[in-house]
């Protein structure tokens, strides 16, 4: 998907540096000083326009949230959404998921959310999928044993691939749903994509996995 260039994005992010952290590697091992507390940190990789993470932050004020988004033209919308929500427990980073270990110390993160990630359906693009083993290793390095991944998608192929990837990596499957919106799971915060696909009658798939302690 081609992202529309927004020439004002840099200035906007600089004006909202309290939300969009411009030098995240400087806070590696010190994110508690950014939030001013020692609450657990949950990250969303591919935070998109920010509806999910801003909603989670409002719903769970005792958890600190950090959204990771590669595209500057998208993260500006997320920054505005967080700003409008007035949630104080969420920050956003305009970085690549490959750099997670440059930004977080081992064990500094407790949970990773992956919501409607690009499925990269072609076999030659497998290594780009956020549930590929390379990325699972990144998540493990910043979470350590006991960390967990919560994963949602509308793409059945990506879901099946991810379950296999989780299993081969040795992760413990603790929850799975092939139709999330008709399940008994409470407190689900929908993303923008999720609302769109659900309105079309598309089932939403969800899995939760954790590292064995």
Swiss-Prot record:
Q: Does the keyword Acyltransferase apply?
A: no
InterPro entries (UniProt xref): SAM-dependent_MTases_sf, tRNA_(Gua-N-7)_MeTrfase_Trmb, tRNA_methyltr_TrmB_bact
- The annotated active site, in chain numbering, is 118
Reaction equations catalysed: guanosine(46) in tRNA + S-adenosyl-L-methionine = N(7)-methylguanosine(46) in tRNA + S-adenosyl-L-homocysteine
Q: In which pathway does it act?
A: tRNA modification; N(7)-methylguanine-tRNA biosynthesis
Write down a Pfam family by its short name: Methyltransf_4
Keyword annotations of the record: Methyltransferase, S-adenosyl-L-methionine, Transferase, tRNA processing
Where does this protein hold substrate?
A: 122, 154, 191-194
Q: Where is the signal peptide?
A: none
- Give the residues the record marks as binding S-adenosyl-L-methionine: 44, 69, 96, 118
Instruction: List the record's Gene Ontology CC terms alphabetically.
Output: tRNA methyltransferase complex
Start and end residues of each stretch annotated as Interaction with RNA: 124-129
A Gene Ontology molecular-function term?
Answer: tRNA (guanine(46)-N7)-methyltransferase activity
Q: Could you say which EC number(s) this protein's record lists?
A: 2.1.1.33
User: Could you state one GO biological process linked to this protein?
Assistant: tRNA methylation
Statement: the UniProt record of this protein carries the keyword S-adenosyl-L-methionine: yes
> Record's family?
Belongs to the class I-like SAM-binding methyltransferase superfamily. TrmB family.
Q: What does this protein do?
A: Catalyzes the formation of N(7)-methylguanine at position 46 (m7G46) in tRNA.
Task: State whether it acts alone or in a complex, and with which partners, per the record.
Answer: Homodimer.
Q: Which protein, by its recorded name, is this?
A: tRNA (guanine-N(7)-)-methyltransferase
What organism is this sequence from?
Bacillus subtilis (strain 168)
What is this protein's gene name? trmB
């Amino acid at each position: 998907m081609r992202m529309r260039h927004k020439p004002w994005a840099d200035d906007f992010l600089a004006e909202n540096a309290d939300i969009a952290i411009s030098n995240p590697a400087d806070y590696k091992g010190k994110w508690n000083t950014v939030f001013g507390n020692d609450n657990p940190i949950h990250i969303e990789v591919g935070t998109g326009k920010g509806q999910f993470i801003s909603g989670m932050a409002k719903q769970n004020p005792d958890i600190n949230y950090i959204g990771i988004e590669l595209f500057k033209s998208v993260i500006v919308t997320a920054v505005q959404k967080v700003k409008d929500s007035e949630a104080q427990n969420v920050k956003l980073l305009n970085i690549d998921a490959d750099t997670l270990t440059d930004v977080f110390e081992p064990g500094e993160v407790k949970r990773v959310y992956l919501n409607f990630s690009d499925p990269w359906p072609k076999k030659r693009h497998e290594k780009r999928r956020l549930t590929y083993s390379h990325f699972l290793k990144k998540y493990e390095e910043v979470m350590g044993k006991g960390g967990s991944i919560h994963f949602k998608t509308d793409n059945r192929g990506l879901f099946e691939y991810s379950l296999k990837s989780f299993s081969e990596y040795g992760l413990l499957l603790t929850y799975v749903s092939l139709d999330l919106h008709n399940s008994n799971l409470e407190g689900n915060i929908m993303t923008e994509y999720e609302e769109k696909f659900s309105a079309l009658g598309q089932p939403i798939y969800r899995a939760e996995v954790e590292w064995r302690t």
